[in-house]
C-alpha cells in the first residue's frame, strides 16, 4: 500500500469513527444540531441514550431555565451545551485537554452560545480550587471522569470542600457500571438515586435546601 493510500485509509477510518461518535443536541432551541468531538479516541462522549436519560430525570426535579452549570471532564461539552440549549444561563466547562477545549470552543461558536460559557483548561483539582476561591456556586454539576481513571469520588469531596454546589443544587456523576460502587455523597449532600443505562451508571446527588430557622 502506497503512502497516499495509507493516508486515505487513516482519513476514512477517522471519518467513520467521527460518524459513530457524532453527537446531536437532543432538545431545546439547538435541537438536532451536531456537536464536534475532540480529535482522537481518548475522549469518551456521553451517549445520546445516556444524555437523554439524564435530562429526563433532571426535568422532573429541577427547572433548567436560568441555572448555572459546571461541566467537569467536559470532553466535547455535550452535557453543558445540552443544558444551554434547554435554558441554562451559563456553563463553566473544565477539562485539562486543549483538544477538548478547542472542540468545546468550536461547538459553542457554531451554536452562538459563546457568551454564555467559560472554558477552564486545567487539571480538575486546581480548577475546582480556583472556582472555590472565587466563591463560584452552581445549580447543576456534571462529573464525567474517564472510566479508566475514575476520579469521581475525589471530585465529589472537592465539590463539598469548596462549597461549589448551591442549596437545592444537583450533581450528576457518570461512571462505568463495572465500577465498584457509586461514590458516597460529599458533606452536606445526599445521594438521591442511582440509575444504570447501558454501560453507564449514573448517580444523582442533591444538596438539600437548608431548613428554615426557628423564630
Enumerate the language-model features and the residues they cover:
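Class I S-adenosyl-L-methionine-dependent methyltransferase catalytic core
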Residues: 2-215
Amino acid at each position: 500500500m502506497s503512502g497516499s493510500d495509507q493516508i486515505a485509509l487513516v482519513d476514512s477510518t477517522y471519518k467513520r469513527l467521527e460518524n459513530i461518535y457524532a453527537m446531536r443536541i437532543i432538545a431545546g432551541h439547538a435541537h438536532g444540531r451536531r456537536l464536534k468531538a475532540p480529535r482522537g479516541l481518548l475522549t469518551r462522549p456521553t451517549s445520546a441514550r445516556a444524555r437523554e436519560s439524564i435530562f429526563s430525570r433532571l426535568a422532573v426535579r429541577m427547572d433548567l431555565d436560568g441555572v448555572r452549570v459546571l461541566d467537569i471532564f467536559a470532553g466535547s461539552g455535550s452535557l453543558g451545551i445540552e443544558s444551554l440549549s434547554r435554558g441554562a444561563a451559563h456553563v463553566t466547562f473544565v477539562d485539562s485537554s486543549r483538544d477538548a477545549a478547542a472542540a468545546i470552543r468550536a461547538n459553542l461558536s457554531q451554536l452562538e452560545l459563546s457568551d454564555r460559557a467559560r472554558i477552564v483548561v486545567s487539571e480538575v483539582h486546581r480548577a475546582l480550587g480556583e472556582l472555590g476561591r472565587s466563591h463560584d456556586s452552581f445549580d447543576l454539576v456534571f462529573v464525567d471522569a474517564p472510566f479508566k481513571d475514575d476520579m469521581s469520588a475525589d471530585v465529589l469531596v472537592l465539590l463539598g470542600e469548596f462549597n461549589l454546589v448551591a442549596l437545592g443544587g444537583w450533581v450528576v456523576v457518570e461512571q462505568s457500571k463495572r465500577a465498584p460502587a457509586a461514590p458516597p455523597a460529599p458533606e452536606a449532600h445526599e445521594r438521591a438515586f442511582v440509575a444504570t443505562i447501558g454501560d453507564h451508571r449514573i448517580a444523582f446527588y442533591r444538596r438539600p435546601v437548608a431548613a428554615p430557622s426557628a423564630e
